[in-house]
Amino acid sequence: VACSLFAQKTPESKQKENIMKSKMFEKETFKKEVVENVKYLYRKTMDEASEQEIFQAVSYVVKDVIIDQWLATQQEFDKADPKIVYYMSMEFLMGRALGNNLINLTVYNEVKEALEEMGINLNELEDQEPDPALGNGGLGRLAACFMESLATLGYPAYGCGIRYHYGMFRQKIENGYQVEEPDNWL
């Protein structure tokens, strides 16, 4: 059972239709879920956990909220049976996910405040997330913009690409020669 970080304000039948408008952030529930994720994922207390482990714990709490909304969206698509756009690109430069997801859930400031109460700086936590190495410039950013536009306009769409195991390569110079190394971004 996924946790809910939001207090219900509408009946269950309306909840999925008005997922963002019908709920309010529950700070104490969020903090409890972060602590529990650190405990169950890493068998540590918050004091023992590294910044990366806390980042992962926070990300899992946010993912639990997003997955519920994603499933609700999929159910609506299944009912409506719309045409779906499949956008294929070799690159998708979506940016870092945690901050974007908090902004899109309209809870960035609330999460920042909750984490501050726990002695955690959200900006420093966001630095724990590497940029996904899914492209190197214009085409990747263009693909991300197309996907954002489709989502904003409410069009059902999927981005299709290649899941790079090592992403883009890192360039290193040894003895005056370029040497490529995999960028293990996952």
Task: Please give the residue ranges for each predicted region.
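A conserved ligand/cofactor-binding region detector
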Residues: 16-186
